[in-house]
Amino acid sequence: MSFEVLEQLEARVQSAVDGITLLKMELDELRAQNQQLKEENQHLRNEHQAWQERLRSLLGKMDQMNSEG
């Protein structure tokens, strides 16, 4: 192989390595973002459940008042 071919091969390999490195960085960022969204989703689900329980309690009290009155 000539020196020129080896240089071209080295450039292609370096380009591939750079691309893989960038993709790994992007993957790490997306994983972190995904984890953050999972935590936010769980928080919102808990909040939603709390509101549902409050609403059920209020509706139960209203039903109780209607049946007594």
Curated annotation (Swiss-Prot):
It comes from the Bacteria. One of its GO terms (biological process) is division septum assembly. It holds the Pfam family ZapB. GO terms for cellular component: cytoplasm. The keyword Cytoplasm applies. Keywords: Cell cycle, Cell division, Coiled coil, Cytoplasm, Septation. It is found in: Cytoplasm. Gene3D superfamilies: 1.20.5.340. Residues 6-68 form a coiled coil. Non-essential, abundant cell division factor that is required for proper Z-ring formation. It is recruited early to the divisome by direct interaction with FtsZ, stimulating Z-ring assembly and thereby promoting cell division earlier in the cell cycle. Its recruitment to the Z-ring requires functional FtsA or ZipA. Homodimer. The ends of the coiled-coil dimer bind to each other, forming polymers. Interacts with FtsZ. Belongs to the ZapB family. This is Cell division protein ZapB. It comes from Tolumonas auensis (strain DSM 9187 / NBRC 110442 / TA 4).
